Amino acid sequence: HISFTVKPSLIKDIFRQSYPYALLGFLMTAYYRIDGVLLERMLENGAYEAGVYASAFRLLDALAIAGFLIAGVLMPMFARMLEENKSIQPLLEIGFKVMLIISVCVGVGAIFYRNEIMALLYLSGDAYSGSIFGWLMVSFICISLTYIYGSLLTAGGKIALLNIISLVGFAIN
């Protein structure tokens, strides 16, 4: 016989501790994903423009996983170093440099071959969709670099600061 009891105080504590992380996830998802909806609503031929944007964004999203994975490897290292009061500067510099090299090489390469990439992947891929992809790849470099600092702030327990940054990003968007 298995018995299951729920203590309201425990549920309240879990919610209170996890709420900032849930809010951060929501805000980051909202500002990262809402562009397609805004394009569709704001432009005269919004459905077409949102489709072109979505086709280019899929590639950005897939490539951004690499930055996310590197940041995911760094976060526990940052957390351990912060807990042990060790300097995070060397790890931060190495992580930033590695991410900068990877993101600039991938980003610049994708910008240079933007039209060919879009034509190869999509039947409707043309110079216009290539230009959209090119601009998104500029943001790829920035997105990749922010993963490093985001993982450092998360490891340091600075979720409130990340929520403020995400809220400002969402408001600007």
Identify the meaning behind each predicted range.
Residues 60-96, 103, 150-155:
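Helix-loop junctions and terminal segments of transmembrane helices
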Residues 47, 93, 110-143:
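Interfacial segments at transmembrane-helix termini and the short loops linking adjacent helices
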Residues 1-32, 42, 73, 77-87:
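Interhelical loop/hinge segments that connect adjacent transmembrane helices in multipass membrane
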Residues 26-62, 80, 115-125:
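Helix-terminus/linker motif at the lipid-water interface of multi-pass membrane proteins
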Residues 1, 37, 66-69, 107-112, ...:
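Membrane-embedded alpha-helical segments of multi-pass transporters/permeases
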Residues 1, 14, 57, 98-111, ...:
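Short alpha-helical transmembrane segments in multi-pass integral membrane proteins
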Residues 1, 24, 28, 32, ...:
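Short runs within selected transmembrane alpha-helices of multi-pass transporters and secretion channels
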Residues 40, 53-72, 102-106, 136-143:
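Transmembrane helix-bundle signature of multi-pass secondary active exporters and lipid flippases
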